[in-house]
C-alpha cells in the first residue's frame, strides 16, 4: 500500500469516528439505550431496541401519513379567543403558538393517502395537551361536514387531555357539536377511522 493511501485511510477513519462522536443521540426513556438522533427520526421516532414510540408533532405525523405535497389545509387562519377572560389564558395560547408554530391544537385538511382522497384530522398534544376548546371543536366539525358533503372518508389522529377548562361551558359544547357531525357522516354511509395516539382521554374519547 502506498504511503499516501495509508494516510488517506487513517484520515477517513478519523473523520468517520469524529462524525459519530458528534452526532446527536436520543436516549430512550424506556430501555435507556442511546441511538443516533437521525436514525430515531428516520424510523418515525420509534426506538429500534424496544419499540418505544415517542409523541409526534402534528407536522411529523402529517409527513408520514399523507402523500407528499398532497395536503391542503382547512381553516388555517382560525385561532382561539379568550371569551371568558380566563387568567393567563391568552398568554398560554401565545406561548403554545410560539412553541409549536400552530394556531391551535388541531390541523385539518384534505390529502391523498396512497392515492386515495381523504379528509385528515391531526391533534397535537404539544399545544396545551391538545385540549378541546371552541377552535378545536369547530375545525373538527367543519372537517366532518366537508367530508360528508364531498363523500370522502375521514381519518383522525386523536391525542388530547380532554376539554379546555379555560373556555368553560363553551368547551363542553364542542362534545355535542363534534358528535353530531360524526353521526351525520356515519348516516351518510361514509368511512371514519380513528387512530388513538398518546394521550387520548376524557371528552375527546367520548365525542369522536
Question: At which residue positions do the language-model features occur?
Answer:
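Acidic, divalent-metal-coordinating active-site segment for phosphoryl/phosphodiester hydrolysis
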Residues: 201-205
Amino acid at each position: 500500500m502506498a504511503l499516501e493511501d495509508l494516510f488517506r485511510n487513517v484520515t477517513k477513519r478519523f473523520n468517520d469516528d469524529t462524525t459519530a462522536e458528534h452526532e446527536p443521540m436520543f436516549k430512550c426513556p424506556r430501555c435507556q439505550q442511546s441511538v443516533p438522533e437521525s436514525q430515531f427520526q428516520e424510523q418515525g421516532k420509534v426506538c429500534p431496541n424496544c419499540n418505544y414510540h415517542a409523541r409526534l408533532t402534528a407536522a411529523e405525523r402529517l409527513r408520514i401519513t399523507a402523500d407528499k405535497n398532497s395536503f391542503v389545509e382547512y381553516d388555517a387562519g382560525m385561532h382561539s379567543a379568550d371569551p371568558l377572560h380566563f387568567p393567563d389564558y391568552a398568554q398560554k395560547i401565545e406561548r403554545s403558538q410560539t412553541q409549536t408554530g400552530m394556531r391551535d391544537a388541531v390541523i385539518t385538511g384534505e390529502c391523498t393517502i396512497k392515492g386515495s382522497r381523504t379528509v385528515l384530522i391531526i391533534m397535537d398534544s404539544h399545544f396545551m395537551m391538545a385540549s378541546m376548546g371552541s377552535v378545536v371543536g369547530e375545525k373538527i366539525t367543519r372537517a366532518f361536514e366537508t367530508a360528508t358533503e364531498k363523500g370522502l372518508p375521514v381519518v383522525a389522529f386523536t391525542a388530547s387531555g380532554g376539554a379546555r377548562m379555560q373556555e368553560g361551558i363553551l368547551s363542553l359544547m364542542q362534545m355535542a357539536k363534534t358528535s353530531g357531525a360524526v353521526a351525520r357522516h356515519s348516516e351518510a354511509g361514509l368511512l371514519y377511522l380513528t387512530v388513538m395516539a398518546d394521550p387520548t382521554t376524557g371528552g375527546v374519547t367520548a365525542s369522536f
